[in-house]
Amino acid sequence: MAQTSSYFMLISCLMFLSQSQGQEAQTELPQARISCPEGTNAYRSYCYYFNEDRETWVDADLYCQNMNSGNLVSVLTQAEGAFVASLIKESGTDDFNVWIGLHDPKKNRRWHWSSGSLVSYKSWGIGAPSSVNPGYCVSLTSSTGFQKWKDVPCEDKFSFVCKFKN
């Protein structure tokens, strides 16, 4: 009798295994849809805001800090860069430069994001950063479809993109 019971248990286990074989266990829970304030756009787990007011780099970053504790946008991947570029282009702006959060605070050509994120992805335009005419703050340029970076003087006034968690 015990042998028959073991036989049925073995058959049951084999049937279960054959039914579940080839199915991957769900390891990630679906992400909740992020809700961003009106006038901003969501990408992954952040909200983005394009402001056409022209400010210096410092004033633009302060504006972003006062707006939901954000910063000028840190572009951490090529995909995020493409999203930011489309956000700027969709605005219909005629600006040639748009501030992002990359800067060289010690003027030693070591770049930092104002958000504190690590600089691992880079998208410098041709000839940038410049050694001939160095700037210590970074903008996206319209000539590259707002996808490439250029170092420019921090005192210049450009529109800008903020990035923040909601």
Swiss-Prot record:
> Which residues, if any, are the signal sequence?
1-22
Q: Which GO terms describe its molecular function?
A: growth factor activity; molecular function inhibitor activity; oligosaccharide binding; peptidoglycan binding; signaling receptor activity
Asked if the keyword Transport belongs to this entry, the reply reads: no
Location(s) in or outside the cell: Secreted
Does the record carry ATP-binding as a key word? no
Q: In which tissues is it expressed?
A: In pancreatic acinar cells and, in lower levels, in brain. Enhanced expression of PSP-related transcripts and intraneuronal accumulation of PSP-like proteins is found in brain from Alzheimer disease and Down syndrome patients.
Q: Which InterPro entries match?
A: C-type_lectin-like, C-type_lectin-like/link_sf, C-type_lectin/snaclec_domain, C-type_lectin_CS, CTDL_fold
Predominant location of this chain?
secreted
Entry function: Might act as an inhibitor of spontaneous calcium carbonate precipitation. May be associated with neuronal sprouting in brain, and with brain and pancreas regeneration.
Domain (C-type lectin) ranges = 34-164
Gene Ontology, cellular component aspect: extracellular exosome; extracellular space
Keywords of the record: Disulfide bond, Glycoprotein, Lectin, Pyrrolidone carboxylic acid, Secreted, Signal
- S-S bonds: 36-47, 64-162, 137-154
Task: Write out the PTM section of this UniProt entry.
Answer: The composition of the O-linked carbohydrate on Thr-27 is complex and varied. In the crystallographic structure, the attached sugar appears to be N-acetylglucosamine, typical of an intracellular protein, rather than N-acetylgalactosamine.
The biological processes this protein is annotated with in GO are: antimicrobial humoral immune response mediated by antimicrobial peptide; positive regulation of cell population proliferation; response to peptide hormone
Q: Which residues carry this modification: Pyrrolidone carboxylic acid?
A: 23
Short name of one Pfam family: Lectin_C
* Residues bearing glycans: 27
Q: Which protein, by its recorded name, is this?
A: Lithostathine-1-alpha
